[in-house]
Amino acid sequence: MEIGIDIEQNERFKDVSEHFLKRVYTKNELAYAFKFKNAYEHLCAMWCAKEATVKAFSNLKIPFLEIEISSTADGKPFVVKNDTILSELTKLGLSDIKISLSHSKEYSTAICMIY
């Protein structure tokens, strides 16, 4: 089992460039975040989830666009198990990945557990 965690200030994501958004977030992630008035809080929480995922994978150099954060119909977040994620899980002899996100007005945090 491996665990990663991250926390960031939401304010850092208020005025990010379009270049940054396209380099870090998938189209699905951007569509989700910008449904909300406080999109920057959701962007920050997804950033934290991506950072926590990288840390759980022992700081492997997984491009952020290869780590897609989504959610179930009832709002439970998850990491999409694409080919990159499945390959990294297999290399570690693990099979599943779970995340939990939280945010307030000031901070967002996420934890990732792979097992």
Where are the predicted features?
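Core catalytic alpha/beta fold that binds nucleotide/phospho-ligands
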Residues: 1-115
